[in-house]
Amino acid sequence: MDGCNEAGLAISLLKLTKNQVHQDDPNKKNITSSIMMKAVLDYCKNVEEAVDFLNKYNLHDMVEGSSLHYLIADSQGNSVIIEYIDNKMLTIKPYEIETVKYLYLTNFYLKKPIGPGNENGLDRYLILKEKLKNDTIMEEENAMDLLIDVRKTTLWSNVYNLNELTVVTALRQNYSIFYKFDVNKPNECLISQSYN
């Protein structure tokens, strides 16, 4: 359900355990998590617009017994993580956690203490933290290598180039076949046995 639009805005999700979100502000319209992601890509051009858009809706998670959190990034280099805790939307920007410019997430809440029910994915998060500590620009192929290093029952791995409007995808931990999509060529898919 991840995606990218023609403005260079991308949104990705990761599953969390427990704490299904059902907001109920009577002054807001309701939206489900799957529709929300498509709507963000349809109506927003950058991270700021996406956050403003999300603030206008009550979110309702579709997956029973679990929640999702989201990483949103744009072609200007802006990014934000969105988490819902106690039915409140929280934003996490670069430098707010770990004092690094990269935002990365796995399958645990960043805005909750580590403990029972919130440690799934911590091992992979710590690998990401270690590998990104030098705070350097990463080439696309190296980004996919990093995703390979932290895979664990991964359904898909995506690397976005938000300036070129492309995404390279590996499915079900099969890193011997890559699918490359270009937003400007929606009916084409390049299949390759190497990243490039």
Protein language model regions, located:
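C-terminal, well-structured catalytic/ligand-binding subdomain of enzymes
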Residues: 2-43, 48, 53, 65-68, ...
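Sec/Tat-exported extracytoplasmic proteins
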Residues: 44, 58-61
